[in-house]
């Protein structure tokens, strides 16, 4: 019900329906977008004990999702990629370092979500949940 009202934001807060959405993203070969988005959400809400801990976490997100040829590389515009690289060099601006990329990826997820609600997998989810 929340998903019907809140769309993608509701889906991201769900449990079982989110599993169906992950299956859809896997079919589209784009589940790395969701994983990145969730990693950044966790990063932004985590209370780091030290600036170094925050920097290590930011570098981990970068090396997993943003670095060229990374395991789960997301598709970003070069200007967003460059801004992240520069921000990682300046440890004073780490809190919102991924914000432009997160916004971009959310838009990609939203496009996938609209394809999902038109798919047979959506109908299966509605029937089962």
Which residues does each predicted region cover?
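Long, compositionally biased intrinsically disordered regulatory segments in eukaryotic proteins
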Residues: 1-129
């Amino acid at each position: 019900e929340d998903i019907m009202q809140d769309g993608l934001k509701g889906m991201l807060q769900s449990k079982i329906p989110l599993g169906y959405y992950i299956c859809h993203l896997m079919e589209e070969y784009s589940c790395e977008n969701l994983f990145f988005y969730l990693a950044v959400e966790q990063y932004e809400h985590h209370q780091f004990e030290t600036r170094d801990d925050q920097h290590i976490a930011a570098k981990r997100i970068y090396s997993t999702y943003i670095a060229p040829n990374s395991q789960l590389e997301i598709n970003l515009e070069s200007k967003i990629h460059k801004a992240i690289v520069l921000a990682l060099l300046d440890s004073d601006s780490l809190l919102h370092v991924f914000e432009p990329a997160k916004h971009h990826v959310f838009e990609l997820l939203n496009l996938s979500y609209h394809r999902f609600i038109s798919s047979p997998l959506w109908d299966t989810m509605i029937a089962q949940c």
